[in-house]
């Protein structure tokens, strides 16, 4: 196992859950045949202890131990407010 903690940056889609947020992570994938770069989005549930995020915020999250069935990421900081 590596010692580096995975961190990602994404946009908050939803904050309707208590102490939880849904973050959209965008990445670019090259099409195997045509070579065009396509945007692909992954939704991740993250833990927000102080309920400080709103929809549209750009945030940094890091991986942690599983906190629930779907949450294994936690909020590090809010980069920009919506």
Swiss-Prot record:
InterPro entries (alphabetical): NA-bd_OB-fold (IPR012340), Ribosomal_uS17 (IPR000266), Ribosomal_uS17_bact/chlr (IPR019984), Ribosomal_uS17_CS (IPR019979)
SUPFAM superfamilies named in the record: Nucleic acid-binding proteins (SSF50249)
GO cellular component entries: cytosolic small ribosomal subunit
Keyword tags: Ribonucleoprotein, Ribosomal protein, RNA-binding, rRNA-binding
UniProt-recorded Gene Ontology molecular function terms: rRNA binding; structural constituent of ribosome
Biological process, per Gene Ontology: translation
Keyword Membrane: no
A Pfam family reported for this protein in Swiss-Prot or TrEMBL: Ribosomal_S17
Keyword Protein biosynthesis: no
CDD domains (alphabetical): Ribosomal_uS17
Quaternary context: Part of the 30S ribosomal subunit.
Described function: One of the primary rRNA binding proteins, it binds specifically to the 5'-end of 16S ribosomal RNA.
Family to which this protein belongs: Belongs to the universal ribosomal protein uS17 family.
Protein name: Small ribosomal subunit protein uS17
Provenance organism: Shewanella woodyi (strain ATCC 51908 / MS32)
Gene for this chain: rpsQ
């Amino acid at each position: 196992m590596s010692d580096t903690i995975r961190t990602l940056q994404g946009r908050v889609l939803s904050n309707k859950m208590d102490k939880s947020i849904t973050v959209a992570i965008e990445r670019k994938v090259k099409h195997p045949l045509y070579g065009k770069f396509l945007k692909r989005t992954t939704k991740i549930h993250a833990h927000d202890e102080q309920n400080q995020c709103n929809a549209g915020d750009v945030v940094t999250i890091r991986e942690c131990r599983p906190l629930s069935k779907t949450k294994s990421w936690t909020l590090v900081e809010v980069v920009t407010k919506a």
